[in-house]
Each structure stands twice: as C-alpha cells, then as structure tokens.
C-alpha cells in the first residue's frame, strides 16, 4: 500500500505543474486562434461602422471585458502559415515573459486602433490594413503554438 501512495504523491508533485502548464498553453493557443486570426477575412454589416468595430465588439464579448483595448492585431492568413514561425523561438521576450519570434515573411494584418475622438463610454476603432512582419509570442521554445502578438516589425 505504501509504494502505491508514494507513487501517487510523486506523480502529483512532478506531473501536476506540467499538466497545469499544458492546459495554460492550450488555452493561450485557442484564444490566439479565436481572437487574432481572421482567415478568410470576414465582412461585418454596416451597422458596426467598419471591420474593427465589429471585430472588437465580438472580442470584448468573448473576453467578457468592457474595457476598450488601445490596439489589436488580426492576421489574415491560415493557421498553418502562422504556426510554422513558432517551430523554433529564438528569443525570450522578458516584457511578456514568453518565448517570441519575428516572422520571416510579411503577413496581411489589420491593425485596430482605438480612436481618440470618442465618448468615454464607447469604443470606436480605426482600421489599417497592412502587409508586414510581426513579433509572435510562442507557447514554448520548440514545436510551439502562437499565443499572442507583441507588435509589428518596423525595421528595414
């Protein structure tokens, strides 16, 4: 009986944190897929007053948060085309406490930026469609999934 209890305690101590981390990575990857990828690009009804207003309304509802994020990036490319960049993450981004990488290719992206000319109780966004490289946050160093976007690459 004692060896079985010892084995169970060992598994809980060793594998418990691993299982929690794996679940956290799966949730991060799923949230990224749901909130940061729109492929093919969706057309929202005119009642939303533009692409970003429809998308950000959906995003705030999905996150159950009424705050207006200042900026949000949406990638218009297939999951596989984005996921490949996290096969090997060459850097650790301390500001985000995550592994990160710069995409090797430019991707079609919509930048949704909060408009400064708005009443404080509403969220109105400007849309900018661009084709750029970006910094992806990855779930781990090797064979990872994207879990966030740190920003756009502004270099040459």
UniProtKB/Swiss-Prot annotation:
Keywords: Glycoprotein, Secreted, Signal. GO terms for biological process: defense response to Gram-positive bacterium. It comes from the Eukaryota. InterPro entries: RNaseA, RNaseA-like_dom_sf, RNaseA_domain. Transmembrane segments: none annotated. Residues 1-20 form the signal peptide. Gene3D superfamilies: Ribonuclease A-like domain. One of its GO terms (molecular function) is nucleic acid binding. CDD domains: RNase_A. Glycans are attached at residue 126. Belongs to the pancreatic ribonuclease family. This is Probable inactive ribonuclease-like protein 13. It comes from Homo sapiens (Human).
